[in-house]
Amino acid sequence: MASTFTATSSIGSMVAPNGHKSDKKLISKLSSSSFGRRQSVCPRPRRSSSAIVCAAKELHFNKDGTTIRRLQAGVNKLADLVGVTLGPKGRNVVLESKYGSPRIVNDGVTVAREVELEDPVENIGAKLVRQAAAKTNDLAGDGTTTSVVLAQGFIAEGVKVVAAGANPVLITRGIEKTAKALVTELKKMSKEVEDSELADVAAVSAGNNDEIGNMIAEAMSKVGRKGVVTLEEGKSAENNLYVVEGMQFDRGYISPYFVTDSEKMSVEFDNCKLLLVDKKITNARDLVGVLEDAIRGGYPILIIAEDIEQEALATLVVNKLRGTLKIAALRAPGFGERKSQYLDDIAILTGATVIREEVGLSLDKAGKEVLGNASKVVLTKETSTIVGDGSTQDAVKKRVTQIKNLIEQAEQDYEKEKLNERIAKLSGGVAVIQVGAQTETELKEKKLRVEDALNATKAAVEEGIVVGGGCTLLRLASKVDAIKATLDNDEEKVGADIVKRALSYPLKLIAKNAGVNGSVVSEKVLSNDNVKFGYNAATGKYEDLMAAGIIDPTKVVRCCLEHAASVAKTFLMSDCVVVEIKEPEPVPVGNPMDNSGYGY
């Protein structure tokens, strides 16, 4: 088998570090040693004798307050740009694209990522507040614009106080303590989301789009709250929803070199084959037969094993990077006996055979007959989703029945919980929402809205819901006075007052985007003691927002508050900025033949 592998030019040539095909001497060496030594895959670079040149830096001290003002100018430019998208009557932002048509977006974090300011100090300020949006997007998937606006409020109110001579260390400590206490109050205001409210949560996040809200709620009802819902770009102008058999688990790719989409940092394969191995893969030679079949068949292959040792992994990575194989690998989910059970579940879903030595199957003799089939595979750094091709539904039903019998026999609650998780992964399937639009530009913008709505719905399922429209943050401001009594000194209490004033910024901006005076709206909302009472910017009415379906996920509001406070703390504690001095661009050298009498 080793000789077959090395003789195959598509794989055997991968071992040679200089990129040329292996000669006979190299093949003979490989046949007598372990395949693909580390130094042959990743040769050690020669030590360079050239000196490292460091770019000069420019220092900006905040002696007269100009540096902080420039940082704040960057914050305000980014926040004002992102802020136009906030609320049901927020507008879109058009982003220039160097290649292709311009992008029209209504998503805060997408806009924030595109901003690069010419002034280096202002650009650092924009980058600081961008962190609030990015972190909120990572954890909650929605609320990015609110995070930026709230951070702008914290910074604006904080800069005024610090400029007046307050101690920024104690001020930021007060902000931190107040934000932490308000998170506790927020959880008290939260309620568990009902099935009938899921559509409202999604619709609000999608800019009051009821069609998107109802579709996401329908998807949740089909696969369950813990089911998996994914998005695809459709080929028609209409949105579509369908459910296919699938499974998701908390294991990501072993190496980032397997990534096929560098923007999302994910691996995506269609019509993929799966190799399941219930042991550690130590030698790449054992995979020769399976890999050669994959090359001849031209299909992508996913390897799921207990682990893959470094030398074998390096061989797979090099083959992938050179385009020889469409391949990815991940560690099997679970540990011990549960790991074997998960592998069996995946095998039944995909029609694969698990390679186990105790049943007489060895990896080096395995062929394509042991491979499973998946219509789609998506791997990220932390999760993996496998969508079956629908040909194993009868086997899946039998497997679910077996697991239900095990639940009846189980004595411990933990064991029952894990068995129920396996049933959900097997029988819940994957709901796929195909987003349709008339043009590519509209499709990109619409997909971002649906993605935000889906993330908001998942966040609502996790931690519950609160009143939306910026009213919950405004109501939290009334809790600050009680929190101030627990703080240690007057300057920390000033920090609490900063939080209190900043909490009204999102509601005021929502009202402003709807063409209404934000201060008037804020006062009218607070004049009513009913916590559900607020301003519906979509209709222009003051009403019970919970009954009107204006709902925010608690997790989103919590992340906005925590991350905005964190960014403000970092900003207010800054007193000096270091930036690189931009080197002047070289003047293009003219043609020495011009005007010499010899040119034409």
UniProtKB/Swiss-Prot annotation:
Report the Pfam families cross-referenced here.
Cpn60_TCP1 (PF00118)
UniProt biased composition (Polar residues)? 1-12
What does the entry say induces or represses the expression of this protein? Up-regulated by light. Down-regulated by wounding. Not induced by heat.
State where it is primarily located: plastid
**Is Phosphoprotein included in the keywords of this UniProt record?**
yes
Null allele phenotype: Normal germination, but chloroplast-division defect and late dwarf phenotype. Lesion formation on leaves when grown under short-day conditions. Cpn60B1 and cpn60B2 double mutant produces small albino seedlings.
Which chain regions cross the lipid bilayer? none
Instruction: Provide one Gene Ontology cellular component.
Output: nucleus
Name the domain of life this protein comes from.
Answer: Eukaryota
Q: Which PANTHER family match?
A: 60 KDA HEAT SHOCK PROTEIN, MITOCHONDRIAL
Its quaternary organisation is: Part of the Cpn60 complex composed of 7 alpha and 7 beta subunits. Can also form a complex composed of 14 beta subunits only. Both complexes show ATPase activity. The Cpn60 complex interacts with the Cpn10 complex. Interacts with RAB during heat stress.
Function of the molecule: Binds RuBisCO small and large subunits and is implicated in the assembly of the enzyme oligomer. Involved in protein assisted folding. Required for proper plastid division.
Q: Under which name does UniProt file this protein?
A: Chaperonin 60 subunit beta 1, chloroplastic
**Gene encoding the protein:** CPN60B1
